[in-house]
Amino acid sequence: METLLAFKVKGGVLCLADSSVNHSIVKMKDDEDKILEIDGHKLLLSAGEAGDRVQFTEYISKNIKLYSLRNSYPMSTPAAANFIRNELATSIRSHPYSINLILAGYDKEVEDGGTSLYYMDYLGSLQKLNFGCHGYASYFLLGLLDRHHKCDLSLEDGINLMHLCTTELKTRFLVSGKYTLKFVSSEGIKVLPFNAPQ
């Protein structure tokens, strides 16, 4: 069950993704990192068909790096979100990607404390949010996040909320898996230790 989950906390964005790659009813691997570090202050969470997911996220990552090399400054998170949305939307007519994305980033110039969180689906829709999730997890977690999430949560409280979310998923899903947790802030990207309930 593919799960992408991200929400804003004080000073940054917490991002969680499952680590499994499945094909039909077979689990191919359980140590896949679905949270791509685009640069020092941007994370791209992706879910979908394995080939589309890897190819599209690598294409996006390399083009954003090329932009920063050509212009001598990095692409802002809002600009990256619009670039990704445009690539998804234009590919629908030629080669549609079966992929859903969440982009999280930190920019000094952005309002709301510098943090940005964007939700994108395979049809190219784009929405700026305070929290978002993709996959079957969204059926269970959106209500829970609506009730418990606040943008001024401390990092520790945010991690506790992530534990609450993964506990809910363990309760609802037949199969539970491993997760990867990352945090993006003004200090850069950190991989945080995270033990989902067994």
Swiss-Prot record:
Location relative to the cell: Cytoplasm; Nucleus
InterPro entries assigned to the protein according to its UniProt record, in alphabetical order: Ntn_hydrolases_N, Proteasome_beta2, Proteasome_sua/b, Proteasome_suB-type
One Gene Ontology cellular component: cytoplasm
Main location: cytoplasm
Subunit-structure text: The 26S proteasome consists of a 20S proteasome core and two 19S regulatory subunits. The 20S proteasome core is composed of 28 subunits that are arranged in four stacked rings, resulting in a barrel-shaped structure. The two end rings are each formed by seven alpha subunits, and the two central rings are each formed by seven beta subunits. The catalytic chamber with the active sites is on the inside of the barrel.
Role noted for this protein: Non-catalytic component of the proteasome, a multicatalytic proteinase complex which is characterized by its ability to cleave peptides with Arg, Phe, Tyr, Leu, and Glu adjacent to the leaving group at neutral or slightly basic pH. The proteasome has an ATP-dependent proteolytic activity.
Name listed for the protein in its UniProt record: Proteasome subunit beta type-2
